[in-house]
């Protein structure tokens, strides 16, 4: 099954603010989510969210098997991403 990767508007804005070389690496990793989203990332404890590590950055996403899509909810530096993400959800 191939999943569509959808960026939440907040994730898209955060991705645009990241340095281009790092942003390119993140986009490469996001492409891998299309085929096997549960194998690429790591499930966050006590939630239905997943985390993808790309150097010092993390991508927080959710897998919707019913719609065959991966929703990227947040992108940020590892020092702040989980605190910032918890404030949103």
Language-model segments: what does each one mean?
Residues 19, 37, 85-86:
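Short, flexible helix/strand-to-coil boundary loops that buttress conserved ligand/catalytic motifs
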Residues 14-21:
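Surface-exposed, Lys/Arg-rich phosphate-binding patches that contact polyanionic backbones
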């Amino acid at each position: 099954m191939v999943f569509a990767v959808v960026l939440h508007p907040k994730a898209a804005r955060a991705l645009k603010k990241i340095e281009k070389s790092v942003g390119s690496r993140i986009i490469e990793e996001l492409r891998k989510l299309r085929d096997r989203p549960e194998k690429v990332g790591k499930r966050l404890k006590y939630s239905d969210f997943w985390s993808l590590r790309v150097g010092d950055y993390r991508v927080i996403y959710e897998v919707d098997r019913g719609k065959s899509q991966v929703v990227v909810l947040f992108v940020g530096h590892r020092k702040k991403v989980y605190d910032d993400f918890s404030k949103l959800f």
